[in-house]
């Protein structure tokens, strides 16, 4: 999520743009956005959570605007087990903004079947250590056209198409 947040903010966001998170996010989905918000002078808005720990979708709808560039929401809460209606969130985001929809799947992916095409999301991120992998590794799934539109955060290896003294071009995803 750190790499994705930095790449999106660097390429697709500008001063005054907005990020929407929820009040029930794990800190792993808060801190990267706080860091890019400070660096790029962005605003973070938080969607309220209802008494049953579900997301207040009316509040989400009211916060979406032309300034909203990212909505990054937990796929399953590590606090309550709450499963947000990702399809409904996707419908709200698409109807009220041009924002990217990112799902933090760290708790979701190890326990449930996830069909990213059916959900209609733009990105899904999850960590390896939640599936007994080593700490510090993770996965970013993204729509191919979006991945190709972003600049890499780090360079090297097979990601290079051509290298010249004055510039490099990136290999397609």
Walk through the language-model features, giving the residues of each.
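Pyridoxal 5′-phosphate
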Residues: 1-173
